[in-house]
Amino acid sequence: MHNSTLDQFGKTISLLLVSFLVLTSCSHKELPVSDLIRLNQIGFYPSEEKTAIVASDKGAYKKFEIRDLQTSKIVYRGLLSVSRSSSFSPKKTTVLSFSALDTPGEYQIEILGIGKSQPFVVKEHLLQDVTLASLKGFYYQRMSTPIEETYAGKWHRPFAHPDDQVMIHPSAVSPKRPAGTIISSSKGWYDAGDYNKYIVNSGFTVGVLLSLLEDYPEYVLQMNTNIPESGNTTPDLLDEVAWNIDWMLTMQDPADGGVYHKLTTPNFEGFIKPEDCQQQRYVITKSVTASLDFAASMAQAARIFTTVEEDYPGYSDKMLAASRRAFEWASKNPLALYRQEELNKKYEPAIQTGAYGDRSAEDEFFWAASELYVTTGEDKYLEIAEQIAPEQFTPPVWSRVAGMGCLTFIRYGGSFDERGKELANRMKSLLLDYTESAVRNLEMSPYAAPYGREAKDFFWGCNSDAASNQGIAFLYAWLLTGDKKYQTAALSNMDYILGRNATGYCYITGFGYKSPMHPHHRLSASDDIVEPIPGLLIGGPNPGKQDKCEYPSDIPDECYVDDQASYASNEMAINWQGLFTYFSAALDASLEK
């Protein structure tokens, strides 16, 4: 080859190289942000698994890069995995794994031909802020008090719902409280997107939050949610729970110990400010499930509040006495289930608000007996628990609370006598049977989480009652076995809730770059503020579509709409909030370095 030819060849190569560099530089700058790249919008822990999903078949795109946004340098390169699919969706997904990226910082994923992700962070204590916001959500749900700007910022509001003129509904009459009797039943939390209060759901929620304190006391002690009680000698979580317990205690009939099922208006209020509500409020008939959920949560609270007698003198004794009486009433009235339709045929006014009904109270009896046994040490409660102990573990939800009793026995099993230890060991085996089966769903799951592999995972409240409570079970399995796979599985479920999912939403209001703006939540809808109250877990995809709203898809994991009218997919509720608060706090505590 002649020298001139060599020179020309060299120039050509140089031009091509420059062109390539220019093109790649331009392509980086011009890459659009792609909604197809789904990840935990809060971020990642440095030493834990890191996974993102491309919500499409990878096609011709085989590589991805990660850019450090501080230095603008590419710090990681990887290959897209094989495509995944599910049995219920025609859509495919592709997994990106970058767990080796362990340096704290802010980053962005880039895939030529697809686009770039939103920026994300890698840092320690990743879930601390969302955990605090989730617990703070209960403060915003308080009633019978002004929500002050000092503690609530722009979401402050005036005093509403004193509940000091509550009427005994005809279904709840007793010799000493005839229909129309006025009682005071103030304080407590608004249950969900509505303005009513329900003992079944409150008792369950209190139990979940108290369990968090029992399981992770050091973490809870350092949680400061900036509420009026912050700075006293009591953890903020207990101060918050006490606000609701104060109300719950007023729901017990002093004559016989039974507990009213709920405090409610006949019909749901409109989307109006709480201070503008005018409907008469009633307490409705006593029920066995309300009495047992009350008994369980009061027994649990009684043993915990002994540690904060300075701020709550005599509180523990009061709660334990109330718990015993409620359990006795339930034992005498085991079939007193709440059946709203039957009540409405007999009494006026008809009640059309949340029923929180049940088909059996056996699981409530087990939970209540478990808590009373732990608190009192009395064998009569152990005997009851032994007789009705579940034969399989089910992650707890308000309507299936046997799992609460299982976790209580697991938590305290080491302090029991031989009989108690035997039952505790059985409960451990049931839990591990469940988690060993559930963790297998992580394999080839379309969004790389045990939750969400099957269509049955999606229903009313699934972000809590399928994803969060399963995550809690995984964390128990990790504590019991030390097997890292369970902790990883729990983190994967959290990744799903916080954005690595089929809709691309982070399902916590006020967090992430795409979160619900129009929840079915009267407090948020009526406050004349654009952003909803932050820190609230939204129910999530629900193919049942009970609200008859217009949904963007019929695919189960996409049946979600950010619409104020969508109570079936876009509401919050204290029971869901409680499970998520536990899950987020426990996960953050377990991953602390």
Which residue ranges define each predicted feature?
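Carboxylate/His-rich catalytic cores and anion/metal-binding grooves
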Residues: 236-258
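Bacterial N-terminal signal peptides that target proteins for export
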Residues: 2-14
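Sec-dependent N-terminal signal peptides
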Residues: 13-21
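Bacterial Sec-dependent signal peptides at the C-terminal "C-region" and cleavage site
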Residues: 21-33
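Acidic, glycine-anchored loop motifs typical of Ca2+
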Residues: 229, 233
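Solenoid-like repeat scaffolds
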Residues: 389-395
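Proline-centered turn/helix-capping motifs that create local helix->coil transitions or kinks
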Residues: 252-261, 334-342, 377, 440-444
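Aromatic (Trp/Tyr) and acidic
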Residues: 37-114, 124, 136, 140-207, ...
